[in-house]
């Protein structure tokens, strides 16, 4: 039986305050409990959705670091975490709020099943904020079996400011979500 929701994420970090502040800003969360070594935050009725642990110095995580003179490669571990918004308006309002705080996505893409914006937190972890492009999971799954998805399973990049402009101009959401 599958889970019914994402319960929480826990990050071990050397920058607890910076990580906490970043996630609280991005998710509209607030701290439930915090001490010198840990912080718990939530954005809904769950006791905590995101937690941060600081139990002492960790080796810095630098995506650009090299070892033995070779180009770095992805290492095992968390690739990204995704959070879904309930509507295009909420999704884009959140983008504008974050943009105005100086938090900008590094990759914006219409995957087909979702329209997504990818961010990096202060430790370099990837965070995907998304909306579903279909009314039901079945419709999204069916689209993933289409020739269009087979030709390009990653998706089509978009400019988030242009998407905001089109949305505010009254372009129907269904039209904004279309991906060839």
For each feature predicted by the language model, list its residue ranges.
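Vicinal oxygen chelate
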Residues: 4, 14-18, 75-126, 131-137, ...
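N-terminal "first-domain core" detector
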Residues: 6-44
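Histidine-centered active-site/metal-ligand motif
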Residues: 8, 47-50, 60, 79-80, ...
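Short hydrophobic/aromatic-rich motifs at helix boundaries and adjacent loops
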Residues: 9-11, 65-68, 88
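Conserved short beta-strand elements that form part of the metal-binding/catalytic scaffold
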Residues: 30-75, 120, 126-134
